[in-house]
Amino acid sequence: SCNSVNSGTIHVACAGRIAYADSFWGSPARPAWTECQAGDDGANDQHGHGTHVAGSVLGDGSNSEEGYDGTGSAPGAQLYMQGVACWHYHPSNGWAYYMFTPNDYQNDIFQPAYDAGARVHTNSWGSNPTAGLPHNEYNLDSLVIDQSAYAMDDLLILYAMGNDGEDANLNGEIDLALLNPQATAKNILSIGASENFRCDMYSVTWSVLGY
């Protein structure tokens, strides 16, 4: 954990509203080469994804580009940040971010945030389907997320649908059955990007559609 998260290193749009930041490394059975075995790297975000998501959630619009309003969905909210990715060195791949899914979703991520006062838990991450199975799989991860939502029925859990959306027939609608497993949970809200064509704006870097 990092108790100085509201220091000068926090983006100005989120400054003063970070209640807690925790780096979570997932299962104790993680590979031996993982640099993160010893603990927590605090609020550092070398990748930028966490900062981007936090700004979308509660950024106050500070430092927005001229002509654009970068205010997040809930600019008055407090943030309890939980990181599931780890920056480390792999003997074969070099330095990179790796993600480890929670071993116990309820007790590892949902319950700590809930106990700290969070009532909306947004997750802009997910895992691939079980090997050999298609997207849209409802698996054990989906089940335990549903169980957590049932146990904490005043906690709204959100999950990103994933980055694998396709529009094979180019009809302007994303094809069905392309969700990550976490987003198939029944008691949560799954979130996906729209496919609106906005040629005067830059595309997101993760877009598989080219716009």
Please identify what each model-predicted range represents.
Residues 1-102, 116-119, 128-133, 151-156, ...:
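Subtilisin-like serine protease catalytic core
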Residues 112-113, 148, 182:
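Generic structural signal for hydrophobic
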Residues 66-69, 170-179:
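Short beta-alpha junctions and helix-cap segments that line functional grooves
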Residues 199-211:
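Noncatalytic luminal/extracellular "stalk/propeptide" segments of secretory-pathway proteins
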Residues 145, 162:
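Active-site glycine-centered loops adjacent to acidic/histidine catalytic or metal-binding residues
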